[in-house]
Amino acid sequence: MNAITETVDLQAPPPVPLVFTDSAAAKVKDLLAEEGNPELKLRVFVQGGGCSGFQYGFTFDEVVNEDDTVLDKEGVQLLVDPMSFQYLVGAEIDYKEDLEGAQFVIRNPNATTTCGCGSSFSV
C-alpha cells in the first residue's frame, strides 16, 4: 500500500497596506463631480503638528509623483507620498456621516495615542 502525503501551505494573505473604503471613494467621486475636474485625485498626507505630534491632511492634487502609492477605487485615485505612507501602513481611510457630522476618518493601527478630534496622533 502506498501512502501519498501532500503538504499544503496555509498562510494568511499578506496584510493590505492601506484600505480605501467604498464610502470614502464614493464621497471623493461626489466631490470631484462638484469640482468639475476629472484629473483631480485625493491626496492623504501626514505632517508634524496637532496636539499629539502628527496630523492627517487631505487635499486634491492633479499630479501623481513617481514615488506615490496610488490606490484606485470606484474610478477615483487616492495618493500617498512615501513619508506619509510609512505612518499609514495598515490604516483605513473611510468617510462617515452620523450625528456628529460628516467627515473623512483614518483608522490607524500605528497610532499609539490620538487626540479627541481624531485628526492628530503619535506613534
UniProtKB/Swiss-Prot annotation:
Binds 1 iron-sulfur cluster per subunit. Iron-sulfur cluster binds at residues 51, 115, 117. Keywords: Iron, Iron-sulfur, Metal-binding. Its cofactor is iron-sulfur cluster. PROSITE patterns: HESB (PS01152). The keyword Membrane does not apply. It holds the Pfam family Fe-S_biosyn. One of its GO terms (biological process) is iron-sulfur cluster assembly. InterPro entries: FeS_biogenesis, FeS_cluster_insertion, FeS_cluster_insertion_CS, FeS_cluster_insertion_RrpA, HesB-like_dom_sf. GO terms for molecular function: 2 iron, 2 sulfur cluster binding; 4 iron, 4 sulfur cluster binding; iron ion binding. The keyword Transcription regulation does not apply. Belongs to the HesB/IscA family. Homodimer. PANTHER family: IRON-SULFUR CLUSTER ASSEMBLY 2 HOMOLOG, MITOCHONDRIAL (PTHR43011:SF1). Required for insertion of 4Fe-4S clusters. This is Putative iron-sulfur cluster insertion protein ErpA. It comes from Bordetella avium (strain 197N).
